[in-house]
Amino acid sequence: MKLVWRARALADLESLMSYIAERSEPAAERLQAAIEACASGLTQHPFLYRPGRVEGTREAVVHPNYILIYRVGAETVEIVRVVHSRQQYP
C-alpha cells in the first residue's frame, strides 16, 4: 500500500511541530519520529487502529495527546488530519 498525506494533515503536522519546537526541540523531534513511524506502519497494518468518529476513517493514537485520522483505500492509506486529543473533532 502507498502512504499519502493530505495537505490538511501536513499543515496540521507543521503547525504542531512548530508549536512544540518553540518549547522543546528534542520533544518535537521525538513526537515527529513517533508520528512518522506510526504513519508508515499503517501501510502494513491499516486496520490495526479503531474506527474513526467520522464514517470511513480510522484513528491511530500516536501519543496520549495526538491522533492520526486516516482512510484506507484499495491501494492507499491516506492521512487526512493530525489532531490533539482535546481538540474538538470532527
Labelled PLM ranges:
Residues 1-2, 90:
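Absolute protein N-terminus
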Residues 57-63:
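A beta-hairpin/wing motif
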Residues 2-57, 73:
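Basic, Lys/Arg-enriched alpha-helical interface segments
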Residues 66-67, 71-90:
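Enriched for short, Lys/Arg-rich terminal
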